[in-house]
UniProtKB/Swiss-Prot annotation:
Name of protein: Aspartate carbamoyltransferase regulatory chain
Entry binding sites for Zn(2+): C109, C114, C140, C143
Keyword Cell membrane belongs to the record: no
Keywords for the protein's UniProt record, in alphabetical order: Metal-binding, Pyrimidine biosynthesis, Zinc
Organism: Methanosarcina acetivorans (strain ATCC 35395 / DSM 2834 / JCM 12185 / C2A)
Amino acid sequence: MKEKRDLKIQAIENGTVIDHITAGQALNVLRILRISSAFRATVSFVMNAPGARGKKDVVKIEGKELSVEELNRIALISPKATINIIRDFEVVQKNKVVLPSYVEGVVRCMNSNCISNSSEPIKSKFSVLRTEEEGVSLHCLYCEHVISEEIAENLL
């Protein structure tokens, strides 16, 4: 009989744990946070881990607490994520991300004719919509284009 073994990720002393990330989105979360091989602190992540509500991803980042802008970006691709702030190996704060009603300069409009994609100095602006069936979608306030499946690929 095979013995069941659990894979454990080392606890972090100070930093952030992002839990309940939509399965398969951990690498996009790292991209949103601009974490690359040049980042010198410890970063660990698990993708497609079994959870009580199905599969999920988890990201742990030593020595970093997230800004409101970073939380808003994560909410766009993973609206059910939770953020745990860790200090001295203890969770001192636990919050769910909050999906903003409006984002500016965060996502590129996919409509090549949109004024926000021209040489004009105009930031993209989207209203944020959430439905249980379709998840998150963004509605461009300039050209009316709707983005739903491609949000992660168009983050600025």
